[in-house]
Amino acid sequence: MKRTFICLLGLILTMASCTDKLSEGYIGPSDIRIEDGVMTPEALLALGRISDPQLSPDGGTILFAVSYTSVEENRSCANLFTCNVDGSDRRQLTAYGKSVSNARWSADGSKIYFIYDGQICEAPYRDGELGRMKKLSEVPAGISGFAVSPDESRVIYISSIKNTALETPADSDPALDKAQAYTTESLMYRHWDHWRTEVPRSYVAPFGAEEITPDNSVDILGEGNLYELPLEPYGGIEQLSWAPDSRHIAYSCKKLTGIEYAFSTNSCIYVYDCESGGTVAVTTSGGYDTDPAWSGDGRHLAWISMERDGYEADRQRLMVCETSLDGGFTVGEPRELNPNFDNDIAGIVWNGDEIFFSSLVSEAVQAIFCADLGGQMLRVTRPDWNFDFDSPFAVLKSGDEVKLLTSYQSLHFPTELVAVDIRESGTSYSQITSENAHILDQLDEVSEESVLVETVDHKQMQCWILYPPQFDSTKVYPAVEIVLGGPQGTNSQGWSYRWCYRLMAQQGYVVIMPNRRGTTAFGQEWKEQISGDYPGLNMQDYLSAGKYLKSKPYIGKLACVGASYGGYSAYMLEGMDEGLFDCFIAHAGIFDEKQLWFTTEEMWFANWDNGGLTEYAYQKGQTGPAGDGITFGGMQQAGAPYATTAKARRHYASSPSSMVTKWDTPILCIHGMMDFRIPYEQGMAAFNAAQMMGVPSKLVVFPEENHWILQPQNSLYWHREVYDWLDRWLKN
């Protein structure tokens, strides 16, 4: 049993160089003490969160951010740190009261550029010390991301423009500046968690010689359109990439608006010429094309591509084309490097003529791979390593040895920096940072197991199981089955600050995490099966996993818990589990599919998955109120509740709301009111239905949260409600 308290002396020493610069509002590492080795929600929120590592130009120092949380102040704050490549000489560079983000080294390593308070700033760096901050931009709309060109003559930055398709009263009458209303005549007027009053845009400006302002900045997309660059809601500076010549910029953009935007995923790769202002399309059709990245010599451009328009979970392919930057820009024919690779590509990183990337694989872990331009792909991380590795942020070569600098995490610990060493004698890893050792070392260990469960159609389904500390198979434990969101995702070794399975196990629960149909680590066939079959085989997969666990003599009562599609699954299983589960928790779940179709924002998702399509194009077809059973109002809508497709009709007829008369098990419904993906009325409707069926039920609504619960105090309350519910129905 580990209850050793490691003092914060090491962390305090790293702050010595900047303690005289502590800003008002600064949030530092927690000195929390754990009682009896049991992890708590408070301990989870106390963990430092590492992000955005960057290697110095000389290859010796890693720059990274760490965010700490104050529950009392109800916020988090990120500051900058450095350490040597081997993890030694950890230094804290900033101690600001507001978060620092997007930190980057200057080309010679003498400065660090970063965003602070919505503007680009710089500070001199020398011998582990950061000098006085200087603001480089004055952009009234603010800056959320940037990338400096290789020769440091130009900078790309992300800001925003007003969305003229969504009007407010003050737009037509300035005297109505206190009136609050939104007026529109087109989709999409809101996205994820916000009304689309602004549109993200990317600009190019001179760098270094003068202050960056709107007056000396050029909008890459030009004027007279409302296209997004980068794509909302998750896109950032990774959607733009400087060419080595510091003149050309590759970027990803979906050049659509209105209803076409709402039904299509057709983003394409373009190259912008900073000198001529011209743009060349590298791709023109299909689904998402994202994350462009130039090779170091500028002779190749790579990106991630989905083949089919409208299918946001299509296989993420590694694409490449030849390019020439001599006297302008020319591009060759795009090609997929390896069409036989049956998993999704993420995080492409060039090193010479090789590309490193990460991918979720059949062991239900995220592994690192290396590809050459001939299409050969080799797995770098070992199959017996139960970690999720991110793509490397740097590759160091010395003779025949290769060192990948990256980050990793597991079900047992959050993100840390790590080095993966590749030698002829074998591959090994060594952890660089130990940001949370002073907290994790106070906790009792939980154990894990990977098992295969037979499904109703005699396939083998991988499941992770976590066991509580000091697990004893002669005793009886309450258990929790995790029903996954997505629906296209994977229960891997990823750490979560919301659904933290180690925290769950440390409360005395056995936790099973099935990778049912629709998960992404087991090939495209396994993933695609779920589209058009929400009430079908994947629900049977969950029942198979639950029955497998309940067959063990050490398992007592069992809960079913999930968010998003997992919330839908909880609502669905409430009506079909035949007494398998003793309570349910549904967070941000779909209760009524027909209602959701008319209120969600990303129509492409519901259109594809509800109709089970295999091909799609948003282009307008026949118009009219009835269309052809698939086309309505000029749009192909095979997944609509008014479509005549067999899969769509089955889908809506089998909505969880159709099964409420079979509900008989206690259920907790949780929802955020700023959730525009699955609006909060879904949670209210499910709770109301449970009440009307006489089922013990509880509703928790967060007025200021979206699909996720992000504010620290709300997160703490969310955890208390979840564990109070589990304890009430499984332990008492």
Where are these regions (language model features)?
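Beta-strand-rich domains and repeat architectures in extracellular enzymes and scaffolds
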Residues: 42-78
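Short loop/turn segments that connect beta-strands within beta-propeller blades
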Residues: 84-88, 124-129, 207-211, 273-277, ...
